[in-house]
Amino acid sequence: MADESETAVKLPAPSLPLMMEGNGNGHEHCSDCENEEDISHNRGGLSPANDTGAKKKKKKQKKKKEKGNDMDSTQDQPVKMNSLPAERIQEIQKAIELFSVGQGPAKTMEEASKRSYQFWDTQPVPKLGEVVNTHGPVEPDKDNIRQEPYTLPQGFTWDALDLGDRGVLKELYTLLNENYVEDDDNMFRFDYSPEFLLWALRPPGWLPQWHCGVRVVSSRKLVGFISAIPANIHIYDTEKKMVEINFLCVHKKLRSKRVAPVLIREITRRVHLEGIFQAVYTAGVVLPKPVGTCRYWHRSLNPRKLIEVKFSHLSRNMTMQRTMKLYRLPETPKTAGLRPMEKKDIPVVHQLLSRYLKQFNLTPVMNQEEVEHWFYPQENIIDTFVVENANGEVTDFLSFYTLPSTIMNHPTHKSLKAAYSFYNVHTQTPLLDLMSDALVLAKMKGFDVFNALDLMENKTFLEKLKFGIGDGNLQYYLYNWKCPSMGAEKVGLVLQ
């Protein structure tokens, strides 16, 4: 949601989810853009827990450098470089690499406090060290909104993707599958299915122009994407129409072309044209200024496989057999009346959700149509189970969505099936029992791991149900809205 007067090359990317995990970064570093592409990474859901950050960063920068120069070496390197001695070229390249490592995205508030954020200092967001006690927009809504699309580098063109066309949907799936978020060690990459993308990108009120693609003019190949979806957001005592920004992705070979900043700038312009001037997004990196910070936790369902693919490791003094026994679950759920959600449950699920979310400070506000879209079960996308008591009343529900990851370069295992905790509402069944049953159901459905953020009331069950803490944070951000920050337990919003 960048200011219209800024130049395109300075624009950073909102978060994805923005898919962002430490969605591992995989993007080229852009020091003058303040890591504009890194915002869209690091969700925290991919990374194996408890690895050291320093090792990851060096490894990642090395890999980036190896694959960096594909398309632009002739255009971007000064001609005089060829006349320098090989030793001198190596010295320069090493200095550039060391500089890049030192200037990588900040993963903690401490790291961020040592950075300058020249771009973000021009944007309608609070400064990192600012103490905010007020509520409201940082700047007023705009009247003069640019009517023409922003200019892409030569040879590229905009295309609003028609995801109702299976061929186009497959193109988007392929772009994300081959270029989207990886963990820091390049071991796992999110694998969004075409059906999941339709669920995530076409909720009630979706607009085709907000499925913003970039194609090569000559070949029509899809090489970039960013999306926005509408969302009514309740922030403290205010309800505001916003967008959620997601799925920023640029083809690996084009990351030196500065396509990502223009993508972000263009989606901002298109959102402004619809009269919306606030956005919510998440990122695994620290930018000015998080409204909340959450941490991913992981519960092993298939510990042998997770250890074999190095998602997790055997603890000291633990054998594989003891580990499998530690994480063993009951064969069936124990809550009486637990069953899959049906169409007839939509009104009561809507009512339960709306009441439950009132205790939190950052939440979605959904109507019945949106509840149907986000919660009605779809195989391999979203699972929702309700608890019906002896009187036929639905009193509780649990939900989790499906997001597998491709396992890179493993001889046996090709995919990691992960369940992500969505919204879980309890009025009669203890939350601990509800979530214990969620683990059992996920195990029965063949999931390898169950992931949950420490938001809402989740901290009350994570350790008791043998979740292990992940190695990265997920920051929540609001664009053009100022309010006090909140603890994770007051965040009541889950983005895909």
From Swiss-Prot:
It is an enzyme of class 2 (transferase). It comes from the Eukaryota. It holds the Pfam family NMT_C. Tetradecanoyl-CoA binds at residues 118-120, 247-250, 256, 258-260. One of its GO terms (biological process) is protein localization to membrane. It comes from Rattus norvegicus. It catalyses: N-terminal glycyl-[protein] + tetradecanoyl-CoA = N-tetradecanoylglycyl-[protein] + CoA + H(+); N-terminal glycyl-L-lysyl-[protein] + tetradecanoyl-CoA = N-terminal glycyl-(N(6)-tetradecanoyl)-L-lysyl-[protein] + CoA + H(+). Its main location: cytoplasm. InterPro entries: Acyl_CoA_acyltransferase, NMT, NMT_C, NMT_CS, NMT_N. It is found in: Cytoplasm; Cytoplasm, Cytosol; Membrane. Its EC number is 2.3.1.97. The keyword Disulfide bond does not apply. This is Glycylpeptide N-tetradecanoyltransferase 1. Residues 1-81 are annotated as: Disordered. GO terms for cellular component: cytoplasm; cytosol; plasma membrane. Adds a myristoyl group to the N-terminal glycine residue of certain cellular and viral proteins. Also able to mediate N-terminal lysine myristoylation of proteins: catalyzes myristoylation of ARF6 on both 'Gly-2' and 'Lys-3'. Lysine myristoylation is required to maintain ARF6 on membranes during the GTPase cycle. It is a peripheral membrane protein. The gene is Nmt1. Transmembrane segments: none annotated. Residues 55-66 have a biased composition (Basic residues). Belongs to the NMT family. The keyword Oxidoreductase does not apply. The modification Phosphoserine is found at residues 31, 47, 83. GO terms for molecular function: glycylpeptide N-tetradecanoyltransferase activity; myristoyltransferase activity; peptidyl-lysine N6-myristoyltransferase activity. PROSITE patterns: NMT_1, NMT_2.
